[in-house]
Amino acid sequence: MISQQAHNLWSRRAFLKVSLVGMALIGSRLALPDWASAEALPEGRLRLFNVNSQERLTVRYRNRLGRYDQTALQDINYFLRCYHSDQVCQMDVQLLEYLNQILSLVGQGKEVRVFSAYRSPTYNNLLVRLGRGAVPKSLHTTGQAMDIAIPGVRLSQVRRTAQMLKLGGVGNYARRGFIHLDTGPVRYW
C-alpha cells in the first residue's frame, strides 16, 4: 500500500503526463499511450453550474482512454462563455483537466459552481475600469482561468489541493466565495 503523499505525487505526475499528451491529441481520435491508460486517468467528467446564467451542464469531455469528445468540448466552451457579451472562447483543455484532477481528490461527482470563466477583453477592461478586481492581462480573456467553488468542500481544501498540484495559478478569494484557478505560471495569492 502506498502512502497518501506518494499517491498524491504519483497522481500529480500522471496528470502532468496525461495533460501534455492530451493537448497533443486534442484534435485526434488516437488513444493515449499505455502509461496514461485507465489506471492513470480519471474519466473526464464534469458537473457544472454557472452562477451567472443559472445553467447546468453535466458532460464527459474525455473517456478513460484519453479520447476527447469535440462536441462536449464545444458545449463546455459555450457554457463557460462571457456572460456579459455572450462571446465564446476555446477553453484551455489543461484547465478542464486541472479542475477534474482537483475533483478526483476532494469532490468526485460533485457539482462545481462557476463564478467566472471566459471574459471578453472588452468586458475584462470594463471590470478593470470599475475596480472590480480584474487585471488588464487576465488569463480569463484567453480561456485559461476559472473562478469556482465546490459545494460541500471547504474553499481552503480546494485551494490547498490546487496548490499541491502545482499546475498553475491559485487565487484565494474566500471572502467573495470562490477560488481562482488558471493554467498560467505556478503562483499563489
Name the predicted role of every residue range.
Residues 2-8, 14-35:
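N-terminal export signals
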Residues 2-3, 9, 19, 38-39, ...:
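Catalytic cores and adjacent binding grooves of peptidoglycan-active enzymes
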Residues 29-59:
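C-terminal segment of N-terminal export signals and the immediately downstream linker at the start
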Residues 51, 62, 115-119, 151, ...:
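Active-site-proximal beta-strand/loop segments in catalytic clefts of secreted hydrolases
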Residues 65-115:
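Active-site acidic/histidine clusters and adjacent loop/turn architecture
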Residues 96-100, 124, 155, 159:
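Extracytoplasmic/secreted envelope proteins and their assembly/folding machinery
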Residues 111-125:
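Acidic helix-start/capping segments at beta-turn-to-alpha-helix junctions
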Residues 121-138:
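Charged, often glycine-rich, active-site loop that binds/positions anionic groups
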